[in-house]
Amino acid sequence: MKKYEITDIAHPDNPNLHRIRAVTDLTEDVLAGMLGGYVESCDNLDQEGRAWISEDAIACENAVVCGDAVLTDHAVAKGCAYVGKNATVTGNATVQDDAIVCGGLLTGKSCVCGYAVIRQDEQTLCAPIIDGSARVYGEISGNVVCRGNAVVLPGTKLDNRTQDCFVLEDDRVSVQTASRTPPPKEPCTYAFER
C-alpha cells in the first residue's frame, strides 16, 4: 500500500524535484492529504515504514530515506546517501555521497559525506548528534556529539558504548560524564509490621 504520492508541485529552484503528499495517516504529525518535502523520484522515499520528508527538505539523485527516518526543515539527502532507522536530519544538514545514517540527529549546517557511517549503538541505544558546521567522513556510533567546526576524518572510528558522552567541538575533545546516583551514606533499614 502506498503511503505517499508525488505531486505536480515543483521545487522553485529545481523543476526535477516535486513535493510529496501523504495518502494515508503515517503518524500523529503526518496525516493523509498533508504535503511533505521534495523528491526526485519514488526511489528516494520508501513506501514502507514511517519515514517522511517534510517542509522544504529534499531527497534527490540516488539517495534513499526509509525506516522511521525523518528529513525536515531544509535538510538534504543526495548522491547515494542512505538515511534509515530512526535518524533525524533537520536544519540545513546534508547527507551526501555514499554516507549512511542509521540513527542519531543531524542538525545545523552539518554534513555527513564520503563513506561516513552514523549509527545508534544497539546495546546502549545512544545515538550521535552532529551539529553546527561539523563534517563527518568517518564512522561514529553511540553517545558522541560533534559540533562547532569539528571534523571526523575518513578512517576515524568513534564507537562509544558508555553512558558518558564524548564531545568533539572545533579542535577539542572532552568527556561529559553521565550523572550517577551516589550510593546511600547509611544502609537502608525497613520496619515491617508484624
What is each PLM-predicted segment?
Residues M1-R50, D56, D68, H74, ...:
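Terminal amphipathic alpha-helical/low-complexity segments used for targeting or macromolecular assembly
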Residues D43-L45, A51, A57, A63, ...:
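Residues at the loop-to-beta-strand transition
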